[in-house]
């Protein structure tokens, strides 16, 4: 809403056709240029922009690389997608396992950085703009945001308040971030495990919202892995509309073939199965959900 209002305040009558983020982003790029528009974007996004005047394709990924964006170059030209399986539809693409990426996966448990498990496919780096000209030359790469730059700026100008002021400032920023992400035309909720990360997000959602937050948790019949009691206690304290699904290890093991179909690449995190279950539970009630992933 802020970016749309800023564009309208410039005095130019804009031919809005709807209320989509994409339409606002295109008008922002036209008004401020690509880098200027990106500086005004918050949260996760990935985009491909064709500049008809310059005959140039730009691929852009959000600051932390939350949204996936893959690309491949070949005799067909350049293809890009948010899912690897979409690239498999290219008739001339013959997927082959990348042995170097497989080595990285076995070492780290994830496919790191810009690597891809399929040979020849690459990922746009987080916070980067890749530009391709009409001759399909190798991409020029520039960054509109780097974590190292932000950390260095923080070192040059450190926070000067005391501990209490630091806590208050952190709370203000988390609250603002949550508030921005609660602007939705569809029902939303949150994953709640009872840990610090998700509990903080839900507490902020409850503070800024007018209705009880719909929260979702997966329980486990194996007590050593069950956090549902903690989640339920947090939900009661905050006044949430809480939902719990209890699964046993046999149920989770049976899901392995199904879950594997949803991942484009190998993924060694055992939490993928409960995450799949809580996502499926959540989808029965709401369309969008916040989580505490990455909060620590």
Predicted features along the sequence, with ranges:
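Cysteine-centered catalytic environments shared across enzyme families
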Residues: 1-263, 275, 279
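Active-site adenylate/phosphate-handling loop in enzymes that bind or generate adenylated species
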Residues: 63, 277-296
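Substrate-binding/specificity loop regions of serine endopeptidase catalytic domains
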Residues: 269
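A short, conserved beta-strand element in the Rossmann-like catalytic core
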Residues: 266
């Amino acid at each position: 809403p802020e970016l749309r209002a800023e564009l309208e305040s410039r005095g130019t009558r804009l031919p809005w056709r709807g209320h989509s983020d994409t339409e606002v982003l295109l008008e922002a790029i036209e008004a401020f240029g690509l880098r200027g528009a990106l500086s005004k974007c918050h949260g996760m996004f990935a985009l491909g922009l064709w500049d008809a005047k310059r005959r140039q394709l730009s691929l852009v990924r959000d600051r932390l690389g939350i949204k996936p964006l893959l690309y491949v170059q070949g005799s067909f030209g350049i293809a890009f997608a948010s899912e690897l399986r979409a690239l498999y539809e290219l008739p001339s693409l013959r997927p082959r396992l990348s042995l170097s990426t497989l080595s990285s996966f076995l070492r780290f448990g994830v496919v790191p950085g810009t690597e891809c498990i399929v040979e020849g496919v690459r990922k746009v780096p987080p916070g980067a703009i890749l530009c391709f000209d009409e001759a399909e030359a190798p991409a020029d790469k520039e960054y509109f945001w780097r974590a190292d730059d932000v950390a260095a700026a923080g070192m040059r100008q450190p926070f000067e308040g005391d501990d209490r002021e630091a806590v208050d400032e952190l709370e203000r920023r988390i609250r603002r971030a949550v508030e921005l992400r609660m602007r939705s035309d569809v029902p939303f909720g949150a994953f709640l495990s009872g840990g610090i990360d998700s509990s903080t997000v839900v507490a902020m959602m409850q503070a800024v919202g007018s209705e009880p937050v719909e929260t979702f948790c997966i329980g486990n019949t194996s007590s050593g892995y069950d956090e549902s009691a903690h989640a339920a206690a947090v939900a009661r304290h905050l006044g949430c509309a809480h939902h719990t699904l209890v699964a046993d290890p046999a149920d989770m093991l049976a899901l392995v073939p199904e879950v594997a179909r949803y991942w484009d690449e190998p993924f060694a995190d055992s939490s993928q199965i409960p995450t799949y279950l809580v996502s499926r539970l959540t989808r029965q009630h709401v369309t969008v959900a916040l989580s505490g992933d990455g909060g620590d």
